[in-house]
Amino acid sequence: MKIDMNLLKRRIKVANKEVKADTVVKNGKILNVFTGDITRGDIAIVDGFIAGIGKYDGEQIIDAQDKVIVPGFIDGHMHIESTMLTPNELSKVLIQHGVTTVMADPHEIGNVAGIDGINFMLNASEKLPIDVFIMLPSCVPATSFENSGAKLDAEDLQPFYKHPRVLGLAEFMDFSSIVNLNEEMLQKIINAHLNGSIVDGHAPGLSKEELNVYISTGIYADHECANVKEAKERLELGMYLMIREGTAAKELKKLIKVVTPTNSRRCMLVTDDKLPDDLIVEGSVDHNVRLAIKEGLDPVTAIQMVTINAAEFFGLRSFGAIAPGYQADLLILDELQTVSIDKVLKKGICVVDNGEIKKEEFKINDNSKELAMKLPKINMKALEKNAFEIPLSSDLCNVIEIVPNSLITHHRVEKVDIDKGNFSASISNDQLKMAVIERHHATGNIGLGIVKGFGIKNGAIATTVAHDSHNIVVVGTSDEEMFLAVNHLKKMNGGIAIASGKEIIASLPLAIGGLISENSYLEVQEQLKILNQALSIIGVDADFNPFLTLSFLTLPVIPEIKLTDTGLFEFKRFSHIKVQA
């Protein structure tokens, strides 16, 4: 909270009714997230903060018309890069959905550009109509079993703790470094604690015994629970539970049953990774709240999970509630049950009215293009003709099987087709070739594997969004189409491309680090619409998002089997395995 003597005196005078408030919100039913009660009263706002609740007069009056007033929503864990939008463009989308604050982990751009990537995200998120707080990337690269664009050590991260919008260390995902007492990685945790900062987690598949080891370091939240058992264990051991509902990972329906009146204040709703078209149409954590209510959760509890619970976990003492001394981030809802948003006030200023952005409040210079000039371009070695060949002496192979709407994959051992000593894609068996091409240092590394579940009949999909090292990942029915899609990415300096036959039938440029578009959110939405339409041309008819699903098949810190630029990786062994079983 920024405060000085004059501001404090002015707030006291408004609270004491000696001077008028800047704005007073009248005639509303106020949700008290501390008690769960609905109360009435005028909300007096001065200098962006609430001075008091009671009977007040102000220079400006906002009539809530007997509607429900709740605190602005907080997304406690998300990645801006996954939205493919600059922070400025993203703010225009989120504010319409009542999201006034986000906790962003820039480990995507950090993996591509290191310190420059974090600086880009901090600078590009200044002075926006939402508050963007940063959790520092803890594991860049995610493991030593792949090649990222950068490496961030403890000493690289240390200076960032001085920044007022840096809150802590984000999703510590390298459990093996804790067990093996890796001092460099442990120093990152120590530095966060010494700076009085939060450390949040990423602990899929850990047993209760392993959780003891993990949590003993002072990691107190997790968003990677795959089932009710894991969720309960984390709550029992003192962790905050982040229930995730994004584009690829949809876990709310199965995990929301864990939330009870006695543990709900230790639970949050988050998005993690959500594509812009889903954000625009469906929403952010506002959608998660609606879904939780639909699944039977009390509306007050659901709203607490995206307001006061998140604020308290991250130590934001002036966020997440409607009370004196709190930032005036308010939503006026038509109904509590439907979370239908009429107005949004950010720091006391009405930025959304009747569900529409007030454009005069969004005259912000988006300097992302200029800031991105420091970020690296695609640097990949030219592909040789046989780059995607997978030699086999036996037809029994390790296969990655997609689990729809989950980041987890299944490890299958299956018989495959062989042609002239090499793996041959099988449309009938839905066994396709997949490759990960290193794109940061021109090493020439190419990891090759076999994947099933995409349902591509003729063509290839390639993208530079490939968690977490963000090399190029491509899947397809033929080497020629895979080559075409990959080379098109190089021309665009990153993005998504779909090839069919001898042509690129759809693409989305992501010129900022190969992750973020330079275009407006409406333009990106239209480009994604064209990409989605192109999926039918190559035969994809999936009930999951193929683009985000593909981008997570390269993340080795999530079970069961993934592919990096150095080869096929099995999570259980935490080591590479061969394609041939």
From Swiss-Prot:
One of its GO terms (biological process) is adenine catabolic process. Gene3D superfamilies: Metal-dependent hydrolases, Urease, subunit C, domain 1. Its cofactor is Mn(2+). It is an enzyme of class 3 (hydrolase). Keywords: Hydrolase, Manganese. It comes from the Bacteria. It catalyses: adenine + H2O + H(+) = hypoxanthine + NH4(+). Its EC number is 3.5.4.2. InterPro entries: Adenine_deam (IPR006679), Adenine_deam_C (IPR026912), Amidohydro-rel (IPR006680), Metal-dep_hydrolase_composite (IPR011059), Metal_Hydrolase (IPR032466). Coiled coil: none annotated. GO terms for molecular function: adenine deaminase activity. Belongs to the metallo-dependent hydrolases superfamily. Adenine deaminase family. HAMAP family: Adenine_deamin. This is Adenine deaminase. The lineage of its organism: Bacteria, Bacillati, Bacillota, Clostridia, Eubacteriales. The gene is ade.
